[in-house]
Amino acid sequence: MQMIKKMVLSETFPGILLIFFTFLALLCKNSSLSVIYTDFFHANFTVGFDHFQISKSLDLWINDGLIAIFFLCIGLELKYEILRGQLKNIRAVSLPIFGALGGMITPALIFIAINYAHDFAMKGWAIPTATDIAFAVGILMLLGNKIPTSLKLFLLSLAIFDDLGAIVIIALFYTDQLSALAIIICLFCIFALLLLNYYHITHLSLYVLVGVVLWIAMLKSGVHATLAGVIISLFIPLDTKNKKPYLHEVLKDLNPWVVYFILPLFAFANAGIDIRDMHLGSVFSPVSLGIILGLFLGKQLGVFTFCFIAIKLKLAKLPENIKYGKFYGICILTGIGFTMSLFIDGLAYKNSDIFEYADKLAILVASFLSAIVGFIYLKIVK
């Protein structure tokens, strides 16, 4: 029993759990369990009453709802580190911002360079710009204490800025219409959160109440609802009026739910991709090459190059006691686009099978390449 407890509480166990549920999902989707798996996550669940109802399939409740809690945790951790921790210095926090810019611009340019002659294919230019923060964090968890905290923070920070960029891209290029009323309600909720923070109110129930309304409004607005989690995190006070730690306590309470329940469930719901109808030959189509080269090469080169230039221009600084070799390994992991890339792919091509699933296969190949190469590289390089 003591051994099991030690294993569960180890730093690597959440990563192992995430990888296990990823492969379990792939197994279910590509076996006789495929129909049961699909029906389970596509089953509709309705919450509300009369005219105030939200009806969504289980996988969307997970992707739009539970993952917002994950983003809340990431936002809280980032806020704490910026105000009290290792990112207090403006040059330290600017590093992941430059990295995120490079990690979006370079893959997009690679995809465009390969697919510029094909109008429909060009709709997917944003597919390789995304980083799946959940899976990238999962790989880091597998590495345990081999990765310094400063590098973990860099990846978390970069992934948040990257996902904020993805949300902006989705809102500008892949949203059919935005609801003005829902956006106004979002602004009212943000104002309410601002007041709660200004008066240093630390009743968690009030933040939950306003947060739920904000999430619903965000859901109805056309903007990705996970942004609500990041917004809420900005307004959670660092301390109580008596100067006792508050934000850190909230984070400590949420963290076990995220790493042991939300992330494994997210992996199980999203990693189920049917690869039986995919042809390996399609990997060499322009769309596939654009995605694979964009995610696997474009991401790591873009993040590293932009960060390197920013450091040399003294606009940012490398974390203390970190060498460029180890830093590059983290850059490789940013190429894990997986579920975020699949999400943008669905928006771009409207879930069309015109490419015979070559686009989805390319996302899988690039993401697994980034994960495996990044993991091995970080294991070897000191």
Curated annotation (Swiss-Prot):
The keyword Cell inner membrane applies. The lineage of its organism: Bacteria, Pseudomonadati, Campylobacterota, Epsilonproteobacteria, Campylobacterales. The chain crosses the membrane at residues 7-27, 58-78, 94-114, 124-144, 153-173, 178-198, 199-219, 255-275, 291-311, 327-347, 361-381. NCBIfam families: NhaA, PRK09560.1, PRK09561.1. Pfam families: Na_H_antiport_1. GO terms for biological process: regulation of pH. The keyword Nucleotide-binding does not apply. HAMAP family: NhaA. It is a multi-pass membrane protein. Belongs to the NhaA Na(+)/H(+) (TC 2.A.33) antiporter family. It comes from Campylobacter jejuni (strain RM1221). Na(+)/H(+) antiporter that extrudes sodium in exchange for external protons. This is Na(+)/H(+) antiporter NhaA 2. It catalyses: Na(+)(in) + 2 H(+)(out) = Na(+)(out) + 2 H(+)(in). It is found in: Cell inner membrane. It comes from the Bacteria. GO terms for molecular function: sodium:proton antiporter activity. Keywords: Antiport, Cell inner membrane, Cell membrane, Ion transport, Membrane, Sodium, Sodium transport, Transmembrane, Transmembrane helix, Transport. One of its GO terms (cellular component) is plasma membrane.
